Regions:
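Conserved catalytic core of the tyrosine transesterase superfamily
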Residues: 1-298
Length: 298
């Protein structure tokens, strides 16, 4: 790793306070361009790369069937790196100064229906054993708190408070927030805690959610869990933890919650981020409007 890249890594970790997952994503993208530049142009120093070299990389990515979304993410990583070099006066102008992101299709995240969520939870209404108790709790936490997948995975045992029905999570950029729990979910937390103490081996004791082998969960484990349960009740293409978080927000809005409250629960820094969840509640709003307005023919 070059000195500038190491300094950039330190900057992301210490100043921007990005998670290890995010930092690695940035570095992987930059290393990918570095490898391309070395192979294509015999140039190991990407600090002084020009836009022509970067454009060649973009063409290569597209030719290798990388989606526009994937290419744009890589360009965002590279742009952040050159912005850092500008800030530290390593370069005078960014080679990506006039770069425009590739166009991407707008895809709506379709939430689960209330019935689909109820149907999944009814499958494990009376969970038996550690894994079923854990799985039901994870599904219910996503649906009743809007917790992010990373927040759930990194939830510490010491941040679970069943006496006042709250959990403390560490969100993006290490921002803490307190999430309220429904009493029924607090009861599940206690039940899971009892099952958890019965594990023969606990390696990652600091973390609340574990595998049956006592290890901390990972991203793919949680994704597979949600996808597996919801595949039995839903034909939607995407069945992920994020869709369940999206469902949490949509169902709150459909049932009268105000946008600012939902924003706080989701841990968004701006209202604009929360507004993407409002499209799903428009159908409910339209229904109320059509039923209530006197000009609509009955």
């Amino acid at each position: 790793m070059t000195n500038n890249l190491q300094s950039f890594k330190d900057y992301l970790q210490l100043e921007k306070k990005y998670s290890p997952h995010t930092v690695n994503a940035y570095l992987n993208d930059i290393n990918s361009f570095e490898s391309f530049n070395k192979n294509q142009f015999n140039d190991e120093n990407i600090d002084q790369a020009n836009y022509s070299q970067i454009r060649s990389w973009i063409v290569s990515l597209v030719d290798n069937n990388r989606s526009n979304v994937s290419v744009n993410r890589k360009m965002a990583s590279l742009k952040a790196f050159y912005k850092f070099l500008l800030k530290t006066k390593q370069i005078e102008v960014s080679p990506l100064l006039k770069h425009k992101a590739l166009k991407t299709p707008k895809t709506l995240q379709i939430p689960f229906s209330e019935k689909e969520v109820v149907d999944v939870l009814s499958q494990i209404q009376n969970p038996i054993g550690f894994e079923e108790v854990r799985d039901k709790l994870i599904i219910d936490l996503f649906y009743t708190t809007g917790i992010r997948r990373t927040e759930l995975i990194h939830l510490k045992s010491g941040n679970v408070n069943t006496s006042n029905n709250t959990i403390k999570v560490l969100g993006k950029r290490n921002k803490e927030r307190i999430l309220p729990l429904l009493p029924i979910v607090s009861e599940q937390l206690i039940l899971y805690g009892n099952e958890r103490t019965g594990l023969e081996i606990i390696t990652d004791n600091d973390f609340f959610f574990l595998t049956k082998k006592g290890l901390k969960l990972n991203d793919s484990f949680v994704y597979r869990l949600i996808n597996s349960y919801f595949s039995t009740v839903s034909e939607k293409v995407k069945k992920s933890p994020h869709i369940l978080r999206h469902t949490f927000a949509t169902h709150l809005l459909n049932n009268g919650a105000d946008l600012n409250s939902v924003k706080e629960l989701l841990g968004h820094s701006s209202l604009a981020s929360t507004q993407i969840y409002t499209h799903s509640s428009l159908s409910e709003l339209k229904k109320v409007y059509e039923e209530a307005h006197p000009r609509n023919q009955k």
